[in-house]
Amino acid sequence: VVRAFLLCALAADHLVLRMHRDIRAHSAAVLARYIVFSKAQLQAPREDWQVAACWGADAACALQELFGAIPSTQYGACRGQGFCIVQLDREGCQFECYLEQTSAAALAPRLAQLIQPGAEHQWQALQIASGIARIEAGTSDQFVPQMLNYDVTGHISFNKGCYTGQEVVARLHYKGTPKRRLYLAGIARADITGQPQ
């Protein structure tokens, strides 16, 4: 896996790739090689949209009240003027909200009334607990999709697409068994000191 991203359609002719900041430049260079064969344009990262995570049992109701509509399926999206909401889980408890800066400023007071603020590390912990592995510069090109459980979580399609290493990935999927996979583990003790190795 060289890079992993979420593709979001902010408009019919405006697609955005959400990925870790430290792989943006390399991803743009790789995509630039292929975009010449299409009628699309690759633009530099834009800072006029913000991403907010929203999670919890009441997240769907709060977003419904705020935006009027929400997606109802995993990786489904609902968009409107200045916003796009993507549902990340099957249960409808994890969402990413893409907000144009003007929309974000206008919605901030109402959002603060409906949703309790959380920290980024809480969202990251939830993503880990959900089995979602993100690719950063240090982990790029270190794993095949099966090692990150992308075949189990629906992050890779075996029916369509063309990507680097497709033959190896498909062979492992149809004829082999991965030697390594991600597993979730936890430690009940809170008094452990030191840095992870």
Model-predicted segments: where are they?
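Basic, glycine/lysine-rich polyanion-binding surfaces/domains
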Residues: 1-197
